[in-house]
Amino acid sequence: MWEQPSIIAVRMKKPNTSPQASLKATVKTGATAASRAVSGFSYSRPFFEDLVDTALKHAKKLGATDAAAEASEGCGLSVSVRKGELENVERNRDKSLGVTVYLGKRRGNASTSDFSRAAIEQTVQAAYDIARFTAEDPFAALPDAADIAVPAEQRTDLDLFYPWAITSEQAAELAMACEAAALQTSKRITNSEGAGVSAQQSHFFSAHTSGFRGGYASSRHSMSVSPIASSPGKGQDMQRDAWYSSMRNAEELASPQAIGRYAAERALSRLKSRKIATTECAVLFESPLAAGLLGSFVQAISGGALYRKSSFLMDSMGKQVLPKHIDIAEDPFIKRGKGSSPFDEEGVKVQARQVVEAGRVQGYFLSSYSARKLGMKTTGNAGGSHNLILSSRLTKAGDNLDAMLQRLGTGLFVTELMGSGVNYVTGDYSRGASGFWVEKGRIAFPVEEITIAGNMKDMLKGILAVGSDTYNYGAKTVGSILVNRMKVAGS
């Protein structure tokens, strides 16, 4: 039996995000209500409202049946370092006005980054001309008035905007601290692919002639590092891994020291990886990878795949597609949530709902267009899903990673996947993978250069357990997932 280095025992403990270990102890964002009024944007909300109204009025003047317009602006700072030296500083700022014009059941789209009056009129004219020569689509239309989100004064503030007034020098200092923490974890951390800090923010305003008006500002900040571990001696082994933290509010980011150490622990744990013989066994997906399984499920029950009849979950409404202990909830109203929004991209009202209850599909993910194509009602998912939480009714508070490894017994614990490898028409699943071979509930040795394969229908129905080691990956929250059986192709 391969002897685990002591660092393996703590490798899967995610960085502490308590105030003591958070970025709040390192740098202040200054994200008070007063400071948020000074956003760093070049354009104000009233300016965007006037821009959009001008576009809509011109569309109606040209003879449009209906029209929609959206003005947006994004800006930010990205800094990367490597081996203690500044590598790249990038400031980005972009703006756009998008216009959609309807002529009956014909639709045209155009956009511009020029906010002058002449450019606005030219853009509307371009959208109008495209609509004139586009074939009719019986399902093309703005959302029904009954589905429009409530007026702005009735919407809940979801606390999505925390501008980070950080300089490039401060960002570089944080990135260097993150990389240094990784390099100082062990003498076997011998190199680095670099560390980075990003501060991004955006705002928009949209409206259409069915009565919707709305917009908001949001932010997304992150810090990451990718260290390289190596083992000395004959047949030198080198392994890379990475970790990151991403939040709306920079003060809630994990500290650079926690991110760096954890990334280093992950890289170290992969040293002396081996190949394994081809087999069939149970597979435990690490929680960040489990979010990918949830994403594949969402895509399969989304409107575009369903009306094109290109989904392995066609006609699944009300059917048992997951075990009875599995629930999936969607909640657009989580404060500071990465998938939170008071309305979808069409201005349609959103709702908290059960997408899956006791393993049965209770709802799809539909825009107004895909809903019409399917003869259903929109679910407020133009632009995709909102915050999703996958849970098991069997999960207990103590079902952490150690408990899930015990539940796995002997099998494969997957911590990295390569390639896309999902056929959404058939459900066939095949991806390159690496991770750890587990025997009797304990990690035996790291493995690499393997392929795991199965069918998504069988994988979903074969979920035995979901861990309490929940991880928020983007807009998806899920613990590690144990699947009963998959093919593992090795040497």
Regions from the PLM with identified roles:
Residues 104, 147-163, 230-250:
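Residues forming anionic-ligand binding surfaces in small-molecule and nucleic-acid pockets
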Residues 90-103, 214-245, 356-357, 433-440:
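Short beta-strand elements
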Residues 13-16, 23-52, 56-58, 62-78, ...:
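Acidic low-complexity segments
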Residues 77-132:
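N-terminal alpha-helical targeting/anchoring segments
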Residues 78-84, 154, 200-220, 235-243, ...:
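Short acidic, glycine/serine/threonine-rich loops at helix termini
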Residues 155, 300, 314-491:
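Dual-mode signal for accessory low-complexity, basic/Gly-rich regions
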Residues 77-93, 196-231, 359, 414-419:
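Conserved alpha/beta core surface patches that mediate binding of polyanionic ligands
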